[in-house]
Amino acid sequence: MNSGPGKKPDWLKIKLTSGSSFASTKKLLNKHSLHTVCRSAMCPNLHECWSKGTATFLLLGNVCTRSCRFCAVGTERRPAMPDPEETAKIGEAVKAMKLRHAVLTSVNRDDLADGGAAHWVETIRAIREVNPGVSIECLIPDFQGDEQALDSVMRERPEVLNHNIETVPSRYASVRPQASYERSLAVIERAKRQFRLATKSGMMVGMGETPEEVNAALRDLRAHGCDMVTIGQYLQPTATHLPVSRYVTPEEFERYREIALDAGFRHVQSGPFVRSSYHAEAFEPVEEISNS
């Protein structure tokens, strides 16, 4: 029987930082009533990123229609309708924050006919309208495999198209039962093969997977056209969420980084606090990737 991961190790102790940039970022987001995955998903890097004046915008509200057992975002079967002013607010926030690289993500909205794809498109266009030259990274949901919805977002040609597999296939039933490993791989493949976009994905470890399974998942991602990958430690957000199976050591994360680079990934972020959008600007430039 698994007795749990034990005491949280020293390498997982967060150093909180703040300052003027942190305060101004928080004030700006509150002013526009904008959601961020940093806050809604209880990201451990919130203080670091906000102190640097960066944030990942959360589209379509902060309530999800799915109930993945690792995620801190709230869930409902029928959340409130999306705020039609959110798109313009995000565009203005990107301008006010003077971002060079804007990162967008969203909750799953399986209650909407298009999964929220039109809202995604409007947001991308709103950002570009008032922020010429800014690069955009889109961490999209799977839109339940709806090709029309996927294509509408991909046709906007974000500089990075990100979709997370989150975990290895053997853990899907326990970790994200409303998702499909194969469907997630198909999203990445579609972005690369049909739209020639720079592609990115991510996964968490410490949820009961084996190193061999992580290595196999990395090979699967490369085989489906994934250019960039993030690997981070799963941290249980509340007592009702999936328990941590074990704490992966920094040395193991370094081995995963080396394995990913050997597999052919162009950029790799692998470490205990790494998340999908952590140091997202480090994945630039992407021109040579999207044309590969």
Swiss-Prot record:
Can you give the residue ranges of the Radical SAM core domain?
50-266
Q: List, alphabetically, the Pfam families matched.
A: Radical_SAM
Q: Specify the superkingdom.
A: Bacteria
Q: Which GO terms describe its molecular function?
A: 4 iron, 4 sulfur cluster binding; lipoate synthase activity; metal ion binding
Per UniProt, [4Fe-4S] cluster 1 binds at C38, C43, C49, S277
Q: Which GO terms describe its cellular component?
A: cytoplasm
Lineage of origin: Bacteria, Pseudomonadati, Chlorobiota, Chlorobiia, Chlorobiales
Reaction(s) the record says it catalyses: [[Fe-S] cluster scaffold protein carrying a second [4Fe-4S](2+) cluster] + N(6)-octanoyl-L-lysyl-[protein] + 2 oxidized [2Fe-2S]-[ferredoxin] + 2 S-adenosyl-L-methionine + 4 H(+) = [[Fe-S] cluster scaffold protein] + N(6)-[(R)-dihydrolipoyl]-L-lysyl-[protein] + 4 Fe(3+) + 2 hydrogen sulfide + 2 5'-deoxyadenosine + 2 L-methionine + 2 reduced [2Fe-2S]-[ferredoxin]
Main enzyme class: transferase
* Pathway the protein contributes to: Protein modification; protein lipoylation via endogenous pathway; protein N(6)-(lipoyl)lysine from octanoyl-[acyl-carrier-protein]: step 2/2
Q: What is its main location?
A: cytoplasm
* UniProt keyword list: 4Fe-4S, Cytoplasm, Iron, Iron-sulfur, Metal-binding, S-adenosyl-L-methionine, Transferase
- What name has this protein been given in UniProt? Lipoyl synthase
Cofactor names: [4Fe-4S] cluster
How is the cofactor bound here? Answer: Binds 2 [4Fe-4S] clusters per subunit. One cluster is coordinated with 3 cysteines and an exchangeable S-adenosyl-L-methionine.
